[in-house]
Amino acid sequence: MSIIIGIDPGSYVTGYGIIKSEKNTLKHIKSGSIFLKKHDFKKRLKIIYICIKNIINKFKPKYFVIEQIFFSKNPSSVLKLGQASCAATLAAINLDILIFEYASKKIKKILVGDGKAKKLQVKNKVCSILNLSKSIGIDTSDALAVAITHHYLINNKDKIF
């Protein structure tokens, strides 16, 4: 049995999702989003770090899995997204958790079968797999998608995705 925390980093909203993985079964433990809009950027990074650290301390995951930063036409946005990702990852580093990172295309390919799938398709698949209400936010479903992807990869090492 392993607890996996998935993170969808963002400089305004960071999603998180925690699942319990046992061989071929998954159970949703907790998920949500950290909303950061009203704070200056440095304060947002601190909030991400503290919130993720507290979540990790509470649920004691074996794996920390984060969605890879993708290239954007706006260098400033990429830099801020990278810093948000680092703030979350630093919490895992400081707590000695195994860290993995997956590209969005790989997550979509594994969950939906199409690396170019739309966010709504991913959300619907996540809700189906975990028996969740479709009212969860996109950031939350993306974070759960990262965690589910890791579950599939560690339990199907012999398969090529």
Swiss-Prot record:
Task: Name the GO terms of the biological process aspect.
Answer: DNA recombination; DNA repair
What does the record say about how the cofactor binds? Binds 2 Mg(2+) ion per subunit.
UniProt keyword annotations, A-Z: Cytoplasm, DNA damage, DNA recombination, DNA repair, DNA-binding, Endonuclease, Hydrolase, Magnesium, Metal-binding, Nuclease
Q: Name one GO molecular function term.
A: DNA binding
> Cellular component per GO?
cytoplasm; Holliday junction resolvase complex
Query: What EC designation does it have?
Result: 3.1.21.10
Q: What class of enzyme is it?
A: hydrolase
The source's domain of life comes to Bacteria
Name of the protein in its database record:
Crossover junction endodeoxyribonuclease RuvC
This protein's species is Wigglesworthia glossinidia brevipalpis
